[in-house]
Design a protein with these regions (language model features):
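Extreme N-terminal starter segment of soluble prokaryotic enzymes
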Residues: 2-4
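Short beta-strand-centered segments at strand-helix junctions
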Residues: 6-8, 13-53, 60-105, 110-137, ...
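Short coil-to-beta-strand transition motifs
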Residues: 149-151
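RNA-contacting regions in translation and RNA-metabolism proteins
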Residues: 186
Length: 191
């Protein structure tokens, strides 16, 4: 079976917890919305931090709202550029992942773990998941079209009331397919 869905390309970014927000931006500081992104209630903020490793540094935009735990999401290319061995993980699975120094306008901290390469995944409204016989935790494929059409395997389904229909891949994967955010791709699966 297959069905079309919009693609969202995720560039490197950071999610901060309240404690780290206070250290990096000042006590009780708030994020300021730069622009909404594809998932309900989420946004790219005006705020940025600098991640520093022994090898290099890079700027990271903060995605809001704040989360229970700080998580940095990089592409494999980004991780290699700064010399990190960041594991490919599902969002939230940060145990024993990479760490680095984070610097903000009000302070800095040493993040012990929390840096990952986010595994590709598809967000689905509950109604969409039900319509196609899928559930949270299922694994599907993404099929892309065009000159550099590819099939990407092992795509995690994340279905629930806090999700909107959208596939998320990182910049490395999007560049391999020569695709940008907003194009349609197909979810392919066997039921």
């Amino acid at each position: 079976m297959q069905f079309p869905i919009v693609l969202g390309v995720s560039a490197r970014h950071a999610h901060l917890c309240r404690e780290h927000m206070d250290i990096l931006f000042g006590k009780d500081s708030e994020l300021h919305i730069k622009k909404p992104i594809g998932q309900p209630g989420q946004y790219a903020s005006e705020e940025q931090i600098t991640m520093v490793t022994d090898k290099d540094s890079m700027k990271l935009r903060i995605i809001g709202p704040l989360r229970p735990e700080t998580q940095i999401e990089l592409s494999l290319t980004d991780a290699r550029k700064v010399g990190l061995d960041a594991p490919i993980r599902n969002s939230g699975d940060i145990a024993e992942s990479a760490g680095a120094k984070l610097i903000g306008p009000a302070g800095e901290l040493e993040l012990k773990e929390g840096i990952i390469v986010a595994a590709r995944h598809v967000h689905l409204y509950p109604e969409t998941a039900e319509k196609y016989g899928l559930k949270d935790g299922d694994i599907v494929d993404i099929q892309t079209e065009g000159e550099r059409g590819l099939t990407l395997h092992n795509v995690l389904v994340r279905a629930g009331s806090k999700h909107a229909d959208e596939v998320h891949i990182d910049t490395d994967e999007a560049n391999a397919c020569n695709l940008e955010s907003g194009v349609m791709v197909n979810i392919v699966y066997t039921k």
